């Protein structure tokens, strides 16, 4: 399938979290919004059609995952990572990364435990840690030779204070 990644889409004044919050967050409107994982490509026509078809139904209750969802997950895991997963093992397939990390933190830690997160990072990770009653331990990433790297000395020093989990994203 060919796709047009070159046509710019103006998302200003569309209630876009990425493009319409710069004054609120940064106090200026000339910021290049690389702070949120949001793509600026037009949605693929097949996705638009599927959403429109579902939206045409008058009731928006909770839905169940259908077999095509599980087939897509199993196919992706096999193609991308070379391993096969049984359908039964996907019974608890979380709906997103933040949800999955939240469940993991609740299983591996208890309120009051220390959780280390490298900075800068994705804002919802911090909220997930603190709203769950865990103590956020920030460790700075270091900009070196044009890329971010870990400050292992800082991480080791902070881990010695009783950090239970290091969240990498």
Identify the meaning behind each predicted range.
Residues 2-96:
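N-terminal small-domain helix-loop-helix segment of the aminotransferase-like
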Residues 60-169:
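Conserved core of the PLP fold type I
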């Amino acid at each position: 399938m060919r796709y047009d990644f070159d046509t710019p889409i103006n998302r200003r004044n569309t209630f876009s979290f990425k493009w319409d919050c710069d004054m609120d967050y940064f106090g200026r409107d000339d910021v290049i919004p690389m702070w949120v994982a949001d793509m600026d490509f037009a949605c693929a026509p097949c996705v638009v059609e599927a959403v429109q078809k579902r939206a045409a139904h008058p009731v928006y209750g909770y839905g169940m995952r259908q077999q095509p969802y599980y087939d897509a997950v199993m196919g992706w895991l096999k193609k991308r990572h070379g391993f096969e997963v049984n359908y039964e093992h996907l019974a608890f397939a979380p709906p997103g990364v933040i949800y999955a990390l939240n469940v993991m933190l609740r299983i591996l830690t208890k309120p009051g435990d220390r959780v280390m997160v490298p900075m800068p990072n994705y804002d919802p990770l911090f909220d997930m840690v603190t709203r769950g009653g865990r103590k956020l331990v920030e460790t700075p990433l270091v900009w070196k030779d044009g890329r971010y790297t870990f400050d292992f000395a800082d991480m080791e020093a902070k881990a010695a204070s009783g950090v239970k989990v290091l969240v990498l994203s």
